Amino acid sequence: MRSSEGAPSWAVALPPPLRPCAYGVSEVTRCWHQLSLGAGESSMNPSATLYRRQNIGSEVETSTIEKQRKELQLLIGELKDRDKELNDMVAVHQRQLLSWEEDRQKVLTLEERCSKLEGELHKRTDIIKSLMKKVKTLESNQAECQTALQKTQQQLQEMAQKATHSTLLSEDLEARNENLSSTLVDLSAQVGQLQAREQALTTMIKLKDKDIIEAVNHISDCSGKFKLLEHALRDAKMAETCVVREKQDYKQKLKALRIEVNKLKEDLNEKTTENNEQREEIIRLKQEKSCLHDELIFTVEREKRKDELLDIAKSKQDRTNSELQNLRQIYVKQQSDLQFLNFNIESSQELIQIHGLKMEEPKALECSKDMCLSDLDNNYPKIDIKRERNQKSLVKDQTFEVMLAQHNGSDKSSCDACREKKLQVNTALGEKSVIALSSLFTKDLLDKQKSWSLGGKIQTEPENKVTLCKVHAKSPKCDGVGLPTEEKQLSETSVSLSDEKQWHDINVYLGLSSCSKQPDRLDGDGHDRTGTSEVSCCTPNVVCIGDNDLSESKCCHPSNIIIEAPGHMTDTEWMNIFKPSRAQRIVRHKTMCTCSRSVSAMKYNSSASELIGMQPSQCVGSLKSAEREEESAALPDRRTSANEKDDFSPTSKLQRLLAESRQMVTDLELSTLLPISCENLNRSKLEVSEEPDEKTTLVSH
């Protein structure tokens, strides 16, 4: 498993790949001991040996991490296959149980049916036996009945013969009676006819005598009537002449009356037309009266509404002014906090540089060895560090994400400077200051007071991809004071981990750990502020990289981060800040860290809904091109899955709250324009109401 200890440091064999189940941190510490023992011969060049050890340790760690990832992926695939097989087995077993229960129920039902049918069969057999007995008795009765029938049939035949003789005799007697009755009818009919003729003759004679007497009397009456009619004719002729004369007179009178009636009709038509015109004028006047009344009412209401709108606009203006003053005060506080943070960072860097000049190289080597071993043995937990005076400060952002832009790297940063800073941090400071970036969210801006809550949110891409990471910067002191400080920090983690579960206060920690910087200053014009860049953070105890790899490994030291805060601003600029813009403000990092753990964390925990705890790791040199291509191909797929999960995450809720707060600010800004718009609406309504009035007047005319 291990190579010989006496071999030179250049020929030290690397340990085989470590499995996560069989090997752990202790095996890595053994490897480091082996490397330290093998490097005893080359004590003449401590900087070169330290550099080689760090490179070898980083390669070992990267190889173990990659193999552990592959094994974990294989184990996860096997577990998924086993889970599918178990699910299939359970489904088949459940189906068999269901079929068995169905068959059992069917058998029980069939047994019940069989028992019922057997009982019915016994009953039917008893009934059949009783019926057989009845059939036998009926057969005996039937035989007796047949004998009685034969006797009765013989008696019936005898009676039928007697009946035939009696019917023949009765027929002969009936024929004789019919002949006698017909003769009697003929004789009676002849007698009746003769009597009727006698009566008719006597009545005819009497009627003829009466007719003769009546005719004589009628002739005498008619002669008298003719005389009277002649006298009446004379009188009628005289009356007719008089009537003709009167008729002519009446005709003349009728013509005169018709002429008068026509004249009266013409007068009546003229009067009706005049009456209709007067009615139309009355209706038009009534309409004008109603329109004038409505206009008066509208004018009164318009004046009232104008007064109300003016009052509302004044109150809204006062509200907006007060809210803008509060926003400005908060923004000024944030700016002062940022300036204080920058001052703390500069002072800490100066202290680090001054202390690094005083330190000596052998102490640096011993401290680096102890540091590496302690970092590998200790699995750093996530610590929610409280705000203290000169160590920590909270930067509050009111309605938008804190813009992290590029910062000009120092020209004199190199591997030696990083090492000196690390030693100074290990010996002098003990604990690093942490910048907690949090965003404040507004709730009920119009009705309630503004309640701001801390929530960490760094927007890294324009597609609203948010990566939240925690970097805990800790380093034990070289002079033996590191152990009690680490125990204190572990006691603080137990309290902070319970607080980290609350999603409403999400703290984003960026460690002030020493890391390798690029000696050449990056051009600010070369990087787009609107381009997409992911924020990745390095942890403490990071080993410097060679000069050839500095162009590829860009570290995420807090000195590379700029928090831009504007100075004095006008009202329009303040309103433009709080407007929801299409181009989202983007957190952009100047350099891209190549920490192996940070890359893995960004690969596997790219969703914005999860807090990514970054464990301490060492910066790796130039990665192989094949591995980078695989990582670049795997990142977009995971980002798409992260976007699907992002809708249900607490960070998405925070983004929605930010959007709502921005919308409220825009509504407050637009509320000042309400009186003008209301007046325009009232004018348009009045114009629309005046147009139908004009149409009604035209129709009435």
Swiss-Prot record:
Q: List the disulfide bonds.
A: none
GO CC terms in record = acrosomal vesicle; nucleus
Instruction: Show where the record puts the motif LXXLL motif 1.
Output: 654-658
The primary location reported for this protein is: cytoplasm
Motif LXXLL motif 2 is found at 670-674
List UniProt keywords, sorted A-Z: Coiled coil, Cytoplasm, Cytoplasmic vesicle, Nucleus, Repeat
Summary of the tissues where the protein is detected? Highly expressed in testis, not detected in other tissues (at protein level). Expressed at low levels in the epididymis, lung, spleen, bladder, kidney, liver, muscle.
Q: Name one GO biological process term.
A: spermatid development
Recorded GO molecular functions are:
nuclear estrogen receptor binding; transcription coactivator activity
State the coiled-coil residue ranges.
Answer: 61-197, 241-342
At the top level, the lineage of the source is Eukaryota
Compositional bias (Basic and acidic residues): 636-648
What are the start and end residues of every segment in region (Disordered)?
624-652
Compartments in which it is found: Cytoplasm; Nucleus; Cytoplasmic vesicle, Secretory vesicle, Acrosome
UniProt note: domains: Contains 2 Leu-Xaa-Xaa-Leu-Leu (LXXLL) motifs. The first one is essential for the association with ESR1 and ESR2.
Function, as annotated: Nuclear receptor coactivator that can enhance preferentially estrogen receptors ESR1 and ESR2 transactivation. Also modulates progesterone/PGR, glucocorticoid/NR3C1 and androgen/AR receptors transactivation, although at lower level; little effect on vitamin D receptor/VDR. Required for normal spermiogenesis. It probably plays a role in acrosome formation.
Assembly information from the UniProt record? Interacts with ESR1 and ESR2 in the presence of estradiol/E2. The interaction with ESR2 recruits CCDC62 to ER target genes, including cyclin-D1/CCND1 AP-1 promoter. Interacts with GOPC.
What's the protein called, per UniProt?
A: Coiled-coil domain-containing protein 62
Identify the gene encoding this protein.
Answer: Ccdc62
